[in-house]
Amino acid sequence: MATKEKLQCLKDFHKDILKPSPGKSPGTRPEDEADGKPPQREKWSSKIDFVLSVAGGFVGLGNVWRFPYLCYKNGGGAFLIPYFIFLFGSGLPVFFLEVIIGQYTSEGGITCWEKICPLFSGIGYASIVIVSLLNVYYIVILAWATYYLFHSFQKDLPWAHCNHSWNTPQCMEDTLRRNESHWVSLSTANFTSPVIEFWERNVLSLSSGIDNPGSLKWDLALCLLLVWLVCFFCIWKGVRSTGKVVYFTATFPFAMLLVLLVRGLTLPGAGEGIKFYLYPDISRLGDPQVWIDAGTQIFFSYAICLGAMTSLGSYNKYKYNSYRDCMLLGCLNSGTSFVSGFAIFSILGFMAQEQGVDIADVAESGPGLAFIAYPKAVTMMPLPTFWSILFFIMLLLLGLDSQFVEVEGQITSLVDLYPSFLRKGYRREIFIAILCSISYLLGLTMVTEGGMYVFQLFDYYAASGVCLLWVAFFECFVIAWIYGGDNLYDGIEDMIGYRPGPWMKYSWAVITPALCVGCFVFSLVKYVPLTYNKVYRYPDWAIGLGWGLALSSMLCIPLVIVILLCRTEGPLRVRIKYLITPREPNRWAVEREGATPFHSRVTLMNGALMKPSHVIVETMM
């Protein structure tokens, strides 16, 4: 088919099936207009709404507490080499791919794949399982941050001293630790920090293991409820509310991060901390774990393979130049991660100098940085209350907009599955309330005395890098080798007016799948069972449960393939050919070949069948 004819075919296809009718919101279906139903899908009121929503969605806690630690751990500046390879080879291509197919189809994370390639619609279901599990445990971090924030409004921070009911006789304040004449006569093995005791004995009330859940922590349960209520009211009116909330939640954290950066750089010992953060160790590049960490960090920080970016893109206008903004947002995301390292390690360098220890002894990642290392650091600064409040507000806002953007993506994907039912009246709002309530109840298991063990189990398995790599591989495979990268480029040209450089197309076809397969295999080879604090070993049943969480998403893709092939009658070759067609071919021609047409929820065009340009599909045509 000539290029001009193929492009015209794409334009006609989008005008008839995907493009919104005049005066209607994107995604409004003809049958709903005939019935006099209200518009089914909103659109962003301005471009900045989309930009800030995406920025809020993927600039989150991982940028502040995970990237700097991984950079220090994996060779300092040398870590940037694998990081940028994965960034340009997989992160940006998959990020743009998810946004653009959402914009092109005006559908959420599940139904967009039903339009593009019904046989692989399990990609959308896998994404929704991952993001549903992620939404249950990610918000628990915000509950902890809320708890710390409430306790920060005191003249003396409660984790700075040992005179509280939760402290043990072994508790020793850091002021005594810094008194060398007193400290040399004591054994460090017998004493603990008040910061650690506040975290483990007051916040968590940590039990002996996951098989000993203990009682519910009502203070944390109330904090969790508060955060879920805030999340609900941020998204309950759809993009009309989300697009306005992000004006504050996505911008204010950058201002606070800048303040913390300036403060950190002015502290004594900051230079040593930054040197420790960036000093390159090229020899570390020979360790496969360094490359695994780089790959998984890219997928985590760009919030890809969760369906959220596709859902956000589905609210764009058809002619919106999302390619340009996706590249700018990528620079913002990775730049934030890099700058956060200066803010964090300058303060860790100050801590190390104040305590007279090596920086490696105070460097932490994840909750250890947010709830142990940094709270300890602020107790050593002038005006500790002010810096504590500032830090935990920043954490809350960074995490909150990521949370409600991911929940919005989850809601959009599910509502698009059943639009005729869930978009009537206030059913969408009721559905959001039900979904948030279920997630809250599941999250209560993580605010018990054994909740930290459950939290780590979800974090290690449910939304692991292995799951994300699995989904990313199939996304790129379907677009590049079944739908056709050139065909999608034709659609992109129709939307934004020009074709992106070949880098994206080649990444979808070769580079991203190769990186995903390599990282996936090495992740399985280097796998070690989960432990807590490198001491507590999870029982076998808990490890099995963790793998069950991981497989619950990964198995969606092959299961949907099997189910659809079984539901479609006819020779296997004809069934596969029909199910990989991005629109409904002529019904009579298909039935003549002995296949029963696949009945998707999506209404597809009869007749015109655009022939994909790749060999794998052409051999079946």
UniProtKB/Swiss-Prot annotation:
It catalyses: 4-aminobutanoate(out) + chloride(out) + 2 Na(+)(out) = 4-aminobutanoate(in) + chloride(in) + 2 Na(+)(in); taurine(out) + chloride(out) + 2 Na(+)(out) = taurine(in) + chloride(in) + 2 Na(+)(in); beta-alanine(out) + chloride(out) + 2 Na(+)(out) = beta-alanine(in) + chloride(in) + 2 Na(+)(in); hypotaurine(out) + chloride(out) + 2 Na(+)(out) = hypotaurine(in) + chloride(in) + 2 Na(+)(in). Residues 1-42 are annotated as: Disordered. Keywords: Cell membrane, Glycoprotein, Membrane, Neurotransmitter transport, Phosphoprotein, Symport, Transmembrane, Transmembrane helix, Transport. GO terms for molecular function: alanine transmembrane transporter activity; amino acid:sodium symporter activity; gamma-aminobutyric acid:sodium:chloride symporter activity; taurine:sodium symporter activity. Widely expressed. Highly expressed in the ciliary body of the eye. Residues 1-18, 29-42 have a biased composition (Basic and acidic residues). One of its GO terms (biological process) is taurine transmembrane transport. The modification Phosphoserine is found at S322. Taurine transport activity is down-regulated upon Ser-322 phosphorylation. This is Sodium- and chloride-dependent taurine transporter. It comes from Mus musculus. The lineage of its organism: Eukaryota, Metazoa, Chordata, Craniata, Vertebrata.
